[in-house]
Amino acid sequence: YKVVLAEHQNYYPDISFVKAADESVRFAVDFKTTYRNPKKPHLCNGFTLGSHGEYFENRTSTKNIQFPYGSYSGHFCLGIIYDRADGATIDETKSHNIDELQAITSVAKNFQFFVTEKWMIASDKGGSGNTANIGSINNIADIVAGRGMFSKLGEHWFDEYWMNYKKITVQDGNGGTKKISTLREFVEYKNGDVSLI
């Protein structure tokens, strides 16, 4: 495989693995980092899993993506979950010589690594405020095991949900309308099996 780095900082994914003998075989790998919640160490802060905007909806689009989304055989996260170092006081403006490397205070510790397909650790909530990003689950054991909200439903449900996130309008039962914004509402709307959520 050849390693193709993202051409721009805001492109998805961070790295594309492209088969040398057949360049139509590609795998997307995005690097993700987050920290453990110090008061609830079984939880982490979560992270974004990429956009659910243009390139996610239009699988042939080349906007903000290295290769069209639909041309990848799989979309993976290589992640690091860590603890923030307690009480580390650091002067971020201070420079150090290379021979002082062992004396530099670390701001992170207790690293845990994971690799999983991104749809397997997705939640049904956006990941970053106003931007069109998919959010992750935040239970660390579930992240490492790939037990996100879509893991029993399958990748098709992940794709359908995020392509339609907050776009489908339904009656709210009180004479008004609302946008579908939870996986349960979406699965019910599509007559799916909500017990798989």
Predicted regions, residues:
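Acidic helix-start/capping segments at beta-turn-to-alpha-helix junctions
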Residues: P13-I15
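Nucleic-acid endonuclease domains
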Residues: K2-Y11, A21-F27, T33-I197
